[in-house]
């Protein structure tokens, strides 16, 4: 059976790709979103095959997330700000971003690192945290927020993994 949809292996869009989408949303929000609504489609195994999620926090900051295990869509993060927007292609393994000035249309491209080395960067950060004990760069509170959001969504969908207790 395909691991992507295997409920015994925590399969589905939320834990496979949604964690990345919700993580970047949380990193750009000044506080955790509290108003969360969604629609989802179950796969034949009961895992989440597709979902759309709307999030809003107390400061009025909002985000939209679209997840799909089947449709071909770009892995793109688009961050809309007051005076510009930021586009990150191939997120979370991006090596560049484009900032577009909303008034002038001027595009500024920023490049850093290598897509091929992206997982290595994550490992370096984790190794550094373990060796030094300094976890400040890991943003653990954001990770906890993302886990809480994902669990809240799965509860709303009544999508529980085998052996899981709420």
Question: What kind of region is each of these model predictions?
Answer:
Residues 40-48, 57-128, 134-141:
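NAD(P)-dinucleotide binding in Rossmann-like oxidoreductases
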């Amino acid at each position: 059976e395909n691991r992507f949809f295997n409920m015994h292996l925590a399969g589905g869009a939320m834990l496979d790709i949604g964690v990345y989408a919700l993580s970047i949303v949380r990193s750009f929000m000044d506080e955790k979103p509290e108003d969360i609504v969604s629609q989802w489609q179950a796969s034949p195994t009961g895992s989440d095959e597709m979902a759309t999620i709307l999030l809003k926090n107390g400061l009025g900051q909002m985000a939209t997330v679209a997840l799909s295990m089947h449709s071909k869509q770009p892995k793109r993060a688009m961050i809309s700000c007051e005076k510009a927007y930021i586009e990150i292609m191939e997120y979370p393994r991006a090596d560049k971003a484009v900032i577009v000035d909303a008034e002038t249309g001027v595009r500024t491209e920023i490049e850093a690192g290598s897509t091929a080395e992206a997982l290595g960067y994550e490992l370096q950060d984790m190794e550094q945290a373990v060796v030094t004990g300094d976890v400040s760069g890991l943003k653990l509170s954001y990770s906890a927020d993302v886990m809480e959001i994902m669990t809240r969504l799965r509860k709303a969908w009544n999508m529980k993994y085998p052996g899981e207790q709420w």
